[in-house]
Amino acid sequence: MAEPVIGLAAGVHRPRNVDWKRAAALLYGDWGTSKAYVIGLAFVAAGFSSFPIILAVCALTAVVGYNYIIICSHFPDGGGVYSAARKQSRFLASAGALLLVANFIVTAALSGWAAVSYLGVSSENARLATAGLILVVGIINYFGPRHSGSVSIWLAVPAVLVVILIVAFSGAHLKIAELEPAHSSFTVTWIQFVGVILALSGVEAVANITGVMKLDPDSSPDRPKVTRTATKAIVPVAIEVVFGTVLLGWAMLSLPKFFGPQLADHKEDMLRFLAEHYGGVAIAPWFGTAFGIAVGIVFGLLLFSAVNTAVVALIGVVFMMAQDGEMPRQLARLNRHGVPQLPLLAAIALPILVLALTSDFNALAGLYAVGVVGAIAVNLGSCSFNRELALGWFQRFIMGSTFLVLFAVEVTIAKTKPDALFFACSVLGIGLTLRFYSHKLSGLTTLTVTRKVADMVVPNLPITMQPRLEEGQKIMVAARGINPVLNFALEEAQLRKAVLCVVYVKEVVVYFAGSPNVRGRPRWQEDPEANAIMSLMLKEGQQRGVCVLPVFAVSEDAAATIVDLSATMGVDCLVIGTTQRGALTNLLRGNVATHIAENLPDTIRLVIFG
């Protein structure tokens, strides 16, 4: 009688299929949208004397972009704030991740408000329309759409083109004489500068996707390197963001002074206003109106994509922390589509709550900077003080200097914007309380030991048990739940004296904001549904004399994983059941059986049991 075999987890790695063009488009969907509202907020902060502030913010943005090229080169598996700060301290990493959570909450609300404004919704109805938009995003994400940034990718080129057209139409009307110097003291100018720091928002996105970027030609999966890919993705986007913001700001400030009230009223959709005005002046009034509508649609959809990105990233950060033991494990529970339930609810409810508690767009923008600046500062500070990173003295100096500037900005925000300070403290307080509760439940404590003792504690323990398989055919069965297809597979394996590989793929459709520190390989014993299936099959296999090999995988694409495992394990026959998904789920996620049939190698027979 064959002995039942308890299989080890099958590790599934995300493919590195994001080239520099796709990475640049994804980055532009986050970073490139900042100009849609930054220049309007600059005018509200300093009026016609805001050009020096815009120049200073763009200069800082360029320096931060250079810093993130360095970060991406040293963190090819994910260089977000959580991954970078974790090398210094788990507590610091959690604090940085919570600041990122605060950033994503306000990003969803602010980008949604700007999106509906660009699409023509009035200021009076913008709050309600934004809440509805966020709810729609939540409903879509309940079914777990992949985080591909498809809208950003398709709209990146049109967005760049309309920016170039606005600058071209305004070129003949740019005036140096209309630019006013700063009228206030350094302290007042610094506070105004801090209020326009939102141009940095989105740059963190590139560090979070290094784990799926294509490797450089001179690297390998064992020694990954994405310096070239990251550089080619960051540089063009940084150039467009910096020069686009400067030129659009110059175009805004070149308008006559009597346009001041109109500029203040259009702070949420400044690019649409500039497109209407300069398009009408350059060609004809009807063209200006049409061009303004086109700009509104392009940037409205791009900002809608930014809302979706923020929601998905917020879910991913909370899920990653829960998987890593920094949040209660209940936050990692998934719905039937592989999406974390409680993080999804929080990602929808919290931005709507912030919308309800803020008075207007300016108040919302005031909450924004505290999260994004704090997260970037923690990331740069952790890297600049990390002696294990092979940084040159110039790189470390630039990174440390940028950290000091951002730290000063964060302190200024805390001093001058009490609402932002209260918001950040609330997110940090609630998050760290949940972290303490999670550690208490799991029995984790913090100990201080010598380096010699710490070096002896390594996660790579020797493997003491290896599966023993019978020679002969291999049959693989993939099923969701206990159903007749499992009995059919057992009968086939018993008849053919074959090894039966029982595959359970746990779908986790979550965008990981960074690369978490995995605490051991995934085990089917820890998943209730997989445990029920595998235990039953091991018992039945032992009674029938069938060698059963459990195979457990965690993946965002069940069909691709099943096909990959079938080919890798060299099975002769794959048995699957008919799809149990509804029509709406098939529309959003696709049919698993169809995907398997289209991609399975011809040498493997496919049996669909219905």
Predicted regions and their residues:
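Membrane-interface "cap" regions at the ends of multi-pass membrane proteins
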Residues: 1-38, 83-85, 91-94, 189-193
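Extracellular/periplasmic helix-exit of transmembrane alpha-helices
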Residues: 218-223, 232-274
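Helix-loop-helix junctions that connect adjacent transmembrane segments
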Residues: 153-208, 415
